[in-house]
């Protein structure tokens, strides 16, 4: 954990695979610390397989959670998927003429990858950011859970309702005054 935080201070990293159970600084604390300054994809790879552990990992900013034992080919596929999405959205080669999107008091500066609500900066994970950007770019269009998943993860949606719902809930908690009566994100 501590080593990951230190490496990120000195080097450019495109993706992190983080274990939860580490000495001195566990993966939860390390992920929280990393999220303060970095928006890179984080995959938690852990022996902790309870639903509560997975939900905690996603709640604190991880973009994915894989339990041990795991299929190495699945891990490679997930890494490629996260990197593809991160690079596509982070690429300076693909720029639109207007990189700032607004809906009421919500503003997304896609050049800086920043989200503000009524002038206050909001920290989102890369997946949360990508979901919000997709929905704001296509205001008024209705997306199904499967369509959101397929647009963000670039893979077929099979039994992913809860994954997308958890991310939507987290976005609402961060951008809405009252998440139960959303102004911006209505699903």
Indicate residue ranges for each PLM-predicted region.
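Acidic catalytic/metal-coordinating carboxylates
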Residues: 3, 26-29, 53
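Receiver (REC) domain active-site loop signature in two-component systems and cognate sites
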Residues: 22
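Basic, amphipathic DNA-recognition helix from helix-turn-helix-like DNA-binding domains
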Residues: 32, 36, 41-102
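Acidic, metal-coordinating helix/loop segments flanking the phosphotransfer/catalytic sites
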Residues: 1-15
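Positively charged, aromatic-enriched patches within helix-turn-helix-type DNA-binding elements
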Residues: 114-186
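Active-site T/S-Asp motif of two-component receiver
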Residues: 18-19, 45
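Residue preferences within the helical output face of two-component receiver
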Residues: 4, 57-58, 148
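His-Asp phosphorelay/catalytic-motif detector in bacterial-type signaling
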Residues: 12-14, 37-42, 158
């Amino acid at each position: 954990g501590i080593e990951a935080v230190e490496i990120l201070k000195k080097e450019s990293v495109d993706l992190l695979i983080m274990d939860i159970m580490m000495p001195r600084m566990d993966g939860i604390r390390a992920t929280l610390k990393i999220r303060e300054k970095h928006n890179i994809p984080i995959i938690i790879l852990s022996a902790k397989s309870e639903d509560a552990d997975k939900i905690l990992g996603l709640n604190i900013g991880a973009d994915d959670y894989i339990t041990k034992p795991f299929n190495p080919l699945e891990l490679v596929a997930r890494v490629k998927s996260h990197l593809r999405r991160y690079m596509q959205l982070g690429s300076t080669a693909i720029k639109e003429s207007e990189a700032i999107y607004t809906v009421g008091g919500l503003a997304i500066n896609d050049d800086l990858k920043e989200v503000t609500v009524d002038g206050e900066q909001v920290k989102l994970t890369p997946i949360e950011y990508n979901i919000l950007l997709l929905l704001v770019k296509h205001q008024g269009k209705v997306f199904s859970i499967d369509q959101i998943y397929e647009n963000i993860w670039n893979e077929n949606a099979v039994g992913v309702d809860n994954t997308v719902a958890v991310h939507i809930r987290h976005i609402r908690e961060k951008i809405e005054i009252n998440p139960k009566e959303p102004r911006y994100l209505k699903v």
